[in-house]
Amino acid sequence: MRYLDFKRFSIYYDPYLIIFITLLSIIGLFFLYSASDGNSSVLIKQSIFVFFGLILMIVLSQPDPQIYYSYSGFFLLISVILVFIAIFFGPEINGAKRWISFGFVSLQPSELCKIFLPLFIASYLYGAKLPINLKNTFLTICLIFVVFFIVSSQPDLGTGIVILLSGLYVLFLAGLSWTFIGTSLAIFIISLPFLWNNFLEPFQRQRIATLFNPDLDPFGSAWNITQSKIAIGSGGILGKGFGEGTQSHLNFLPETETDFIFAVIAEEFGLVGLTILMGLYFFIFIRCFYLSINARDRFCRLVIGGLSLVFISTLFINIGMVIGLLPVVGMPLPLISQGGSSLISFYIAFGIIISMASHKKLVPR
């Protein structure tokens, strides 16, 4: 059932997505409470974000897709302006200026860019002939890299990479030719030495180097990954139990509430807990994939496909980072890690997805 009809209005929703997103969010609170050593203030704050985020998701699923099509450029522009405000006027935390402080809460506007950039690109490419022509491809790639470089300059390479992928996903789904993809990949590989020496910050280069050789800095940049691997491996099949993780609760594992909460889950709930968690993520992605291929027009297919790939990419980047396959770039575990901006951004994304999937009216060309 996609919507409920009343005399004056209809409520649009997707019961499967809503149920499993809510379930994952509630389980996430359970995991976060353990990762924070039973810190009730962390739990209460995150619970507030979850509550209002779920309401926001339902609210954003009600507008017709035409609204998102028409105002996608405005949404992206506001997001980029907020990023500039964070860069020039935001507080500096750990050497980065990524947030806008409102006193009791902070906003990380780059999280909005990863949602509204693919939305705008989908609206721009909607109606283009397949395969999309060189002009549309060039303009789209320019926009993607402009937003990528703006966000990465904060510096925030992790979110920048997701933003880069979010735009490229929509471009690929819109019919980007394999020849262009292969050529671009070759150019990227050739330019790696230049990017290494001129684009990456020293600490970012150090993280990549220690990924391949932890002995270069075992008590510095390699410490996080080493402790994370120990935590994951020690969890075994059933885990050590709720609140019993030694790596996390004895302060060997850093950032337990944010970047490395996946390792905490593995240590305390073992392979069984991870299987249940990944099952929830898998179902949400498969449901979004189903909604994408059954969407009623090309714009909706591009949006649902692009946003669902952003969701699953964030998941795999976080897991890859935690298990030592990718460098540490500061990537939250979707719908679970502490942080209101990331949480709310995904609720916005799912609200848009449900809107695209549940409305019968086609977006006019």
Regions flagged by a language model, labelled:
Residues 1-3, 318-365:
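A juxtamembrane structural motif centered on a specific transmembrane helix
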Residues 18-26, 30-224, 263-323, 348-352:
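Hydrophobic alpha-helical transmembrane segments of multi-pass inner membrane proteins, especially
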Residues 2-21:
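N-terminal membrane topogenic signal
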Residues 9-10, 136-137, 250-253, 295-296:
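Helix-boundary and loop/linker segments of multi-pass membrane transporters
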Residues 210, 214-258, 269-273:
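TM-adjacent membrane-interface loops and short helices in multi-pass inner/ER membrane proteins
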Residues 156-161, 240-245, 256-258, 275, ...:
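Transmembrane helix boundary and interhelical junction motifs in multipass membrane proteins
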Residues 103-113, 153-155, 236-240, 331-346:
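Glycine/serine-rich anion-binding loops at beta->alpha junctions
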